[in-house]
Amino acid sequence: MINLTNIKEYKDNKELLKEIKEEFKNSSDLIIKTIKDIDVIFLESLCSSDKINEYILKVLSLSKKKIKDLNNILVGPNTKKIKSKSEITNLLLNGFTIVLGNNWYAVETKGDLVRSVTAPTTESDLHGPKDSFNESIQTNLGLIKRRIKSPDLVNIDMDIGLYSKTKVSIIYISSIAEVSLINKVKNKLNQINIDGILDAGNIKQLIGKENRSAFPTSQLTERPDKAAADLLEGKIIILVDASPLAISLPS
């Protein structure tokens, strides 16, 4: 975790940026932009790009003078000053964008994922959440991260398919999942040699095609709450871009 050091004890923001990168080194959606010596940091899967542009990037770009006080130009409706580094991890995991200048600020830029999703159609639950995965891998990652707010939640991206270059994300909780299972899944995905991947079913079929006795079985799910529950049990989730289903293994 980022330590409790107060902002006043740091001469610049380089050390803080280094610590943030280290803590979220396994989060492929961590984005860092620098505009006029101001650092802007956010988790892409949890944030609205429109809000970031409107509240932060646009005003930084339009400012003609050197920015001395961020509080005078940030326009987000929920903007707070950060006093210590211990706040940053939780803010990032809750959809805030961190802005680092002479002072540190957090601007709420949470994406409205609910409008992007619909209720489950094949795995309905009268008492469960009414959201389901859709065809956007970024939205689906955000739906999981909304439920598990920890830097231990790892997501590693890779492209599979000679022509399709389909984005695939391996997700697990590093402090819970077994290393042997993680390595087995990574190796299996790296061995896939195919022209194109069109949905999660293709991946499920390919990773279970050989060595059935050595590789655990998997199942498909359309529910983010089910995927989150499986992650908390040490399972691995695989998301495939353009597919509204996630792969959970072992089943």
Feature-to-residue mapping (PLM):
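Membrane-embedded alpha-helical signal segments
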Residues: 1-251
